[in-house]
Amino acid sequence: AAKEQAAADANILSIGVDANQNYMHPGQVLTSMLKRVDLAVYNAFSEGESLTTGFNIMGLAQDGVGYALDEYNEGLVSAEMISKLESEKAKIVNGQIKVHDYMSDNTCPVK
């Protein structure tokens, strides 16, 4: 919340992280990166007694992460931007774009 406030005070856009923070400073938060913990919990409870423990990866294909679009940022995100985002998302989901898995080797390929 502090970074969103600082960005709003400086009249620059920010991006919220983990949950939808667009409402905190309408028109100043470009979007929020969503970590869909709500969906993960719902899915776990839905499995009931058949729940298997361990790692359960929920990426773009499983709607485990995403971005927020709502009345608070609708004027900031154009249809062209959404189209491009969805196109790139589809490329990640279908494997056309490879996203490095940090958990696989504890490294980041970007220096």
PLM regions with names:
Residues A1-K111:
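A residue-level marker of the well-folded mature domains of exported/periplasmic proteins
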